[in-house]
Regions:
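N-terminal Rossmann-like dinucleotide-binding module
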Residues: 2-56
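Beta-loop-alpha module in the N-terminal Rossmann-like domain of NAD(P)-dependent dehydrogenases
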Residues: 46, 57-119
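Hydrophobic residues in well-ordered beta-strands that form the structural core
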Residues: 16, 63, 101-102, 127-129, ...
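Contiguous beta-strand/loop segments that form the cofactor/metal-binding neighborhood of enzyme cores
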Residues: 195-268
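Predominantly a Rossmann-like dinucleotide-binding segment in NAD(P)-dependent oxidoreductases
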Residues: 22, 134-217
Length: 293
């Protein structure tokens, strides 16, 4: 998204909007790794944190968001603010004609998401949200198998993405503040199964969910599941949690003539084109470039 944002421009200048998110440092590293992108400025809702980060990155710090967005040496922004603040900062960035890369999730309500989309379209800026697993080999393998028809009619998907952040206490305390984060495990980790399901199965039609809290501070959900029915009648069971010390990564995609199953790093499949039953693919699709590129 960043490289080549401005046609003919040799260097794209980036404004980092907050270090709140746990992946903010990773995104800064990705920007710095690009030969044609540079972090020129940092803004943060926590001025002390932002000032320290700007010094670490060798960039300017601007405590006023409007002034930061008005800088001539800013072409695009990377949004890592609290989720609850996404709408405000993204709308300002769009109106300032800055291209936008944002951490997921986009916003905390559908109305806010639609307002953001409208502002992006009206202001003609480029936009990308971080859905990293779309670039992973598993997603590309499944997409190819569906497109080729080698699984038959796909009718079921199950995906689990979980970790033990609440169970073992390694997430920052503010991660459990619903007023900042917008929710708990499903809002954070659960979005990965959600967008993969949409990528593979199409448009969702109805959803039923169960969220509960076992140990996470603040009462946010740390153990959750959603069952989604799609327009093509496929059903997806999408699981997540902050208490998943074992079995954090599981995936199943089932069709009338084949299936793809992955547990951890172990993957096997069977298709209508292979008569020998289950097999392990010799080669998976290549990992695609990250969205920030």
């Amino acid at each position: 998204m960043i490289a080549g944002t401005e046609k003919g421009k040799s260097m794209v200048n980036i404004l980092m909007l907050s270090k709140w998110h746990v992946h903010a440092k990773d995104y800064a590293s990705m920007v710095k790794a690009q030969p044609d992108a540079k972090i020129t400025c940092v803004w943060d809702e926590d001025a002390a944190r932002g000032q320290a980060w700007a010094q670490e990155l060798g960039a300017a710090f601007e405590p006023d968001l409007d002034k930061a967005l008005a800088r001539a040496d800013v072409d695009a922004v990377v949004v890592d603010t609290p989720t609850a603040d996404h709408k405000r900062v993204i709308l300002k960035a769009a109106k300032a004609k800055k291209h936008i890369f944002t951490e997921k999730v986009l916003a905390t309500t559908m109305a806010d998401c639609l307002e953001i989309a409208q502002a992006i379209n009206e202001n003609g800026v480029k936009f990308c949200i971080s859905f990293p697993r779309l670039t992973w080999p598993l997603a590309q393998l499944c997409r190819k198998a569906i497109d080729e028809g080698s699984l038959g009619r796909v009718h079921y998907m199950r995906m689990r993405v979980a970790h033990d952040g609440a169970l073992r206490g390694w997430l920052p305390d503010y991660w459990y503040d619903k007023d900042l984060a917008g929710g708990g495990a499903m809002m954070d980790l659960g979005c990965h199964p959600m967008y993969i399901a949409s990528y593979l199965l199409g448009k969702p039609m109805r959803i039923s969910s169960v969220f509960n809290n076992t140990c996470a501070p603040g009462g946010v959900d740390d153990n959750a599941v959603s069952v989604v029915e799609f327009e093509n009648k496929a059903i997806a069971v999408l699981e997540t949690g902050f208490v998943g010390s074992i079995g954090g990564e599981m995936f199943e995609l089932l069709g009338t003539q084949g299936a793809i199953i992955q547990v951890g790093k172990y993957l096997k499949m069977r298709t209508s084109k292979f008569e020998g039953g289950w097999y392990i693919p010799d080669k998976l699709p290549e990992q695609q470039a990250p969205a920030l590129r």
